[in-house]
Amino acid sequence: MNQREQSLAEQRTTVLQKADRKIWVTFRKEGIHRYPAAATDPALATGDEYDVSFLANPHRHMFHFRVWIDVWHNDRDIEFIQFKRWLENLYRDSTLSLDYKSCEMMADDLYGLIATRYPNRTIWIEVAEDGENGAVIQYNLTQPVLSIKL
């Protein structure tokens, strides 16, 4: 193996060892929420085709969750089927009654529960209304590196 090939092999090994490993799971839960400000905020209650004042009233969604969490090796120190079942059990009792909570607020609440059970891990949470519109929040322990020089 020449020097260039050796260098590239070492680089691949380093990248593999330092790889950011995550598992992800999905689950869904019915919920009812509302957005009180939609009734009075002129940017929302526009009176035209962009009017969303109806969001001030309680309305139903099927909330779709996708959760990513760090794992430390390829044998999965968090088994994703068990992780999914645990997450589903957090919401097993009836329909979610969320009042004014947004997708972002729901993600923050869920992050607190996950981080308590699985500390010291980067966690990303996506919450979507009916699988159409939603939010993703990345709860990073460290800020992502823009580039790595190997």
Which sequence ranges carry the predicted segments?
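Charge-rich, low-complexity N-terminal segments
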Residues: 2-150
